[in-house]
Amino acid sequence: MASEQSNPRLPRRPPYMAEKARATLKEAFPNTDDAIIRAVLAASGYKLEPAFNALLGLSDPQVAEEMEQAETSYAYDTAAHDDPVQRQLEEDERCARELANRYNSHRPERRRKTNNDRRNYPPQNRTAKPNDNDGDDYSFFEDDLPVIKDTFMRGFQSFKQRSMEWVENIASKFDGEEEDDDDEKYSAPSKIYPSPRRSTAATLESAYEERPPSLPRRKPSRPGTAITLPPYESDPHMLNEKDFERLRLESSSSPMMRRSSLNSNRRSVESSSSAAFVEGQSFILDSNGAIEVANSAFALDDSDLESAYNEELEMKKDTSKPTASTKEVVVEKKPDESRKQAARTLETVSEEQMGSSNAKSKVLTSEPKDSTSVEAEKTETDEPAVGKGASDVSDTAEISEKTEAKNADSEANLEEKSDVGEEKESKDENNKASLHKDVEEKDTKITNEDTGKTETDVKAKETDSIEANDKDEKTDSKETEDKVEETESKEADVKAKETDSIEVDDKEEKTDSKETADKVEQTDSKDTNEKPAKDDNKEANEKAEKVDSKDVKEKIEEAADLQNSGKET
């Protein structure tokens, strides 16, 4: 008894749901035994409603019969609903009723709309349909909309055909006007452009601005109309100064290749061949000796080149004897040095002509070709043509002497320049050596300064590290003192709790002893029921005492460890 009184009493546990249900059933059916109530609860899965119904059936047989009838009817209903065919029929019926309700709810609004539409718009001549007579089944989307769509498509197709015919008529008219313009252009070109002998770059640009060339004609879509090939390129454009800078004189195997190189390819070749002037063209010599084509506003097509070549062959066959009206002269072959000198003479001649005339450029026009010019082109000579006539050829000797003198002067100037360059190179080398020395001296100064800075930095870092260590030691000592104070306070708290727990245990033991004495005197029949509870209380008290003792020991050990660690620090 002393051990039982020493153990504290455990708190009461909250009742479970099963206990609550058992208590409610006991209140509802006080005459039934506890064993029956527990059995019914266990059979119903500890659910209150089915257990209540079962106990009610035990007490009242009429209620049991009613419950059986209700269960049989419910089972029949579930069996009927389980049939898939019956279920589908029921769902269809429900869906049909919902649709009928919706349709009937919107019927008056639909009738009002149809009546208003019929008042606003006049009656149309449309084919009668079976749905027109039924006022209730009338719908705009099913009856009127297809008719409107059909009429709209027919009107659109007719409009499309008319517009296509109108466009074709306009195109045919424009084709006829372009044919007339082409005929006028090829019949009388002198009205549009001036003669090649009097033409200049300014006049050509003004003529191009007044009437630019027409674009290439498109092929007609209908049979019967004339098909004409485009005489020019699809994208004509005016030539700039940059285009003329790349033009040079060259000698080629045929006049067709010469013309293609001058007009389309624009290849840059050494100016060492004779000037092959073509009929109808004019060339401009600028101050640099570069040749510009004055009337090459449009690029020639291959068909034009072939026609020109055929005309030259016919002229060659017709004319077998040379005439006196030629201005081109055939010059005998010379070595490579004579070619270069003759090429230089072109520049000198152009400068003299520019000085005499006080103009920026001089236009050299080519006369119609005779047999001598054709022979000159056929021989494929690489010698330059110095002038237009024999008088120009006689002056080439003097010009060549002048050029030789100029070349000698230029060589002397080059030698002087080479000497000056060597002197500059020697000066540059000396300057570089002095610069290298200055750079090395600066580097040595910088390295010395860096070493001094590094020493001062190392000293500063050492002092900083010492100060940081001192601060860390101070903070560690403060932390140890704080920990010791905390451990002391914890020990005091533990002692106070122990004393409080001892006093509480004494009080509880006294009260328990009094209560047990009263209970023993009052009820002897309850001893058998209270023995297992007391055993449970003893075990629980023993476990609680063990746990409390372990917790106290652990706290004491932790406090001792903290004290030891504080002493060590």
Swiss-Prot record:
CDD domains: CUE_Cue5p_like. It comes from Schizosaccharomyces pombe (strain 972 / ATCC 24843). One of its GO terms (cellular component) is cytoplasm. It is found in: Cytoplasm. Signal peptide: none annotated. Residues 67-139, 175-275, 311-569 are annotated as: Disordered. Keywords: Cytoplasm, Ubl conjugation pathway. Residues 17-60 form the CUE domain. GO terms for biological process: signal transduction. Pfam families: CUE (PF02845). The keyword Cytoplasm applies. Residues 347-364 have a biased composition (Polar residues). Residues 104-113 have a biased composition (Basic residues). It comes from the Eukaryota. Residues 79-100, 234-249, 329-340, 367-381, 399-500, 507-558 have a biased composition (Basic and acidic residues). GO terms for molecular function: ubiquitin binding. Residues 250-274 have a biased composition (Low complexity). This is CUE domain-containing protein 5.
